[in-house]
Amino acid sequence: MQSLSLNSSTLQSPSMALVLIRPETETTGSSTSSRALQEVIAQLAQELTHNGQLDESSPLGKLLGKAMAASGKAGGGLEDIKAALDTLIHEKLGDNFGASADNASDTGQHDLMTQVLNGLAKSMLNDLLTKQDDGTRFSEDDMPMLKKIAEFMDDNPAQFPKPDSGSWVNELKEDNFLDGDETAQFRSALDIIGQQLGSQQNAAGGLAGDSSGGGLGSPVSNTENSPGSLGDPLIDANTGPASNSNSNGDVGQLIGELIDRGLQSVLAGGGLGTPVSTANTALVPGGEQPNQDLGQLLGGLLQKGLEATLQDAGQTGTGVQSSAAQVALLLVNMLLQSTKNQAAA
């Protein structure tokens, strides 16, 4: 009876009850992730662990290290790394991410890993720039990813005109600040690559709770003022990138540019077809009365100019998107690469 009385007294003490309950909580864990997602987390944790501790030499390792330090788990072992990864994935990709993955096949398991890495890469893009005054600043820790973005911009000068430093890679070397115009250009690149990461993530199986595609939500352009979507090759070809002019525009100037473009195409050997040839013959001095008026000639040149513009715009858009898709894959592969391996690559 004395023993029963002692146990009852012990259990009535809040502090002692906490001591009794806490070890059980730590042992069982509190993850609500699906079994499939927990297996992915375990694989990632192994990749990020060196000598029993987190290796922070990779971009994902650095991100996880900051998260663990913020939660008081810096220097923790494998189980702490798993718990931090679990929390990070749900914070970045949604509470219900991977909820239906337990019903997936082995292929689905691989797809889930792809979704996790693409989703984390996309979220990291959104955190690369931090607002400061009338521009943004960036961290030296993020330089491996930033450099890939800058190289993408330098490879597509029609979409991203060179800054004063001569190249976007050089711009990153000058200091860790981008002014307003530079920030807009950089966020435009982030948005295009983010769309590719989102598309690749969705194509991997659509198991995530938040499967919405699109950009990063960064303020690349003001939708109230911009007449078209960001990076639309046809709009850029006609009005210039990120045009905020009135939607009516200067129609006369646009028509003049298209006619000039058509004339250049004809002189380059493109040809305008029979109607315009007839007009050219009829306009020779001393010839018969013209069979076509000047309007038909200008109409042919206008049509040819429009065709050339559309063709170039399509090639530009395809080139940028293809380049962005390649960079997106590179960024995903970089997540688990140490800084040393990145330098070798």
Swiss-Prot record:
Induction of synthesis: Expression enhanced by contact with host cell wall. Also regulated by HrpRS and HrpL.
Region of interest (Disordered), ranges: 202-247
Biased composition (Gly residues): 206-217
Any one GO cellular component localisation term in the record: membrane
Chain residue ranges for the region called 2 X 7 AA repeats of G-G-G-L-G-[ST]-P: 213-275
Disulfide pairings: none
Cellular localization per UniProt: Secreted; Host cell membrane
UniProt keyword annotations, A-Z: Host cell membrane, Host membrane, Hypersensitive response elicitation, Ion channel, Ion transport, Membrane, Repeat, Secreted, Transport, Virulence
Chief place of localization: secreted
Assembly and binders: Homomultimeric.
Name of the molecule in the record: Harpin HrpZ
